[in-house]
């Protein structure tokens, strides 16, 4: 069944001229994410009228689904913008405010109600790479000395202002995290039962200053709807929800993907040309000098090209295959290094495995190169069969050696970066590819010079 696009329906309703009450009722059937998608197709005046129809609670939900809330918040007077932000979950509010200039952000934060301002300021105090910056303060909290009846009463009292009610978090008399209760267990419990029996004391948690990259896999492994976030004193300061986890995983993947290209994860469509150039140029300068080194090595084999010009036809193939293999090994290694419990023996096993994979792939490609390139050189370059297969054999052996070494380089470099506490994703694709180009050039032209020219006197 084809996925339905509701945007056109929503726009048609908005432009239909229905009375406000009827329009609000019909729009309430649509998810806030679909309503958010429709905002860009409206004029500023139409958006203002829509906000008035929907009410601040719904508008706050819609804003939480926007990828970039800045242009929409700036359309609102600061007082109205603050009202919308105060009705958003704290983590969504911080995401929306992060898109604003510091002056606009401070103006809105200054007009938030006391509780919202405290939550937002707390989340803004964390670094972008810390769990605390992505948590929400929207959760149910009860004390461990309550009865079942009191806990149910507290749940009903807090549920009106909190969406995350599937798990109740329990604190002791000192406000320290004590455990968690599943909502289902509380609902089916008898009034005379002890609340203590329902509390999961060994409930998993994360700490507010933990790096997102260090604990994201652990959060995913628990597969809970939410996890508590504790400070250094063991106090409950927020929770990480499953929706937050999806965003964090997506951000981490985007971050690693950018680093594999030698970029930064912050670059986007709204960033200026100068800022993008400033972020990319250092990598490109470093790679320029490495490229010059590769070129100088190629220049050292001018005599080989002069005697046997055909070898230059297959240079790019050997270099590309070496680079591809190195990048594959890099991607596998970065994924494995996420496991903080990875032992030295497992790292050596990975290194040995990647080299064997490179060897097997290289051998298979070498056989193909021997046959196909041999025929190509004979029929299209007019070499006799013997010389044609000697040349294709040299290419094949070069592929084997270059691919094994490239597998080694693509595995060992991120391991070294990880050892010295540098993000292994920084050992990016361009760097690995350039190093492997250097290795492949030396192997290919070295074999051609030693075997084909010095030993067999071809050319």
PLM feature spans:
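Alpha-helical transmembrane segments and their membrane-interface boundaries
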Residues: 255-408, 412-424, 434-435, 447-459
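Alpha-helical transmembrane segments that form the membrane-embedded catalytic/substrate-binding core
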Residues: 238, 433-444
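Hydrophobic packing positions in regular secondary-structure scaffolds
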Residues: 1-260
């Amino acid at each position: 069944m084809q996925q339905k696009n509701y945007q056109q329906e929503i726009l048609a309703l908005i432009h239909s001229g229905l009375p406000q009450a009827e329009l609000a009722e019909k729009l309430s059937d649509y998810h806030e994410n679909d309503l958010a998608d429709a905002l860009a197709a409206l004029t500023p005046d139409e958006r203002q009228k829509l906000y008035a129809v929907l009410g601040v609670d719904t508008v706050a939900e819609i804003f939480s689904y926007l990828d970039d809330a800045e242009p929409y918040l700036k359309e609102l007077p600061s007082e109205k913008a603050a009202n919308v932000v105060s009705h958003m979950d704290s983590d969504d509010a911080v995401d929306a405010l992060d898109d604003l200039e510091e002056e606009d952000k401070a103006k809105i934060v200054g007009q938030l109600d006391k509780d919202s301002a405290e939550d937002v300021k707390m989340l803004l105090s964390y670094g972008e790479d810390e769990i605390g910056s992505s948590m929400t303060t929207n959760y149910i909290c009860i004390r461990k000395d309550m009865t079942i009846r009191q806990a149910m009463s507290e749940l009903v009292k807090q549920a009106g202002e909190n969406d995350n009610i599937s798990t109740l978090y329990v604190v002791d008399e000192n406000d320290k995290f004590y455990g968690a209760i599943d909502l289902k267990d509380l609902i089916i419990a008898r009034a005379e039962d002890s609340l203590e029996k329902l509390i999961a004391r060994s409930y998993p948690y994360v700490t507010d200053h933990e790096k997102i990259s260090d604990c994201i896999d652990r959060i995913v492994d628990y597969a809970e709807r939410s996890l508590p976030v504790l400070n250094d004193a063991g106090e409950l300061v927020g929770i990480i929800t499953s929706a937050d986890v999806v965003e964090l995983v997506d951000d981490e993947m985007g971050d690693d993907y950018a680093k594999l290209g030698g970029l930064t994860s912050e670059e986007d469509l709204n960033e200026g040309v100068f800022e993008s150039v400033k972020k990319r140029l250092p990598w490109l300068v470093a790679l320029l000098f490495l490229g010059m080194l590769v070129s100088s090595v190629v220049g050292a084999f001018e005599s080989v090209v002069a005697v046997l010009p055909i070898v230059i036809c297959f240079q790019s193939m050997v270099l590309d295959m070496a680079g591809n293999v190195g990048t594959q090994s890099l991607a596998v290694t970065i994924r494995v290094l996420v496991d903080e419990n990875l032992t030295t023996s497992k790292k050596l096993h990975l290194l040995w495995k990647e080299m064997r994979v490179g060897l097997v792939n290289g051998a298979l490609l070498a056989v193909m190169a021997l046959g196909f390139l041999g025929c190509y050189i004979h029929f299209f370059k007019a070499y006799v069969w013997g010389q044609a297969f000697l040349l294709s054999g040299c290419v094949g052996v070069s592929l084997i050696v270059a691919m094994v070494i490239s597998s080694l380089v693509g595995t060992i470099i991120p391991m070294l970066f990880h050892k010295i506490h540098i993000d292994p994703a920084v050992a990016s694709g361009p760097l690995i590819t350039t190093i492997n180009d250097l290795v492949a050039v030396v192997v290919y032209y070295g074999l051609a010079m030693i075997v084909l020219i010095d030993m067999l006197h071809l050319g």
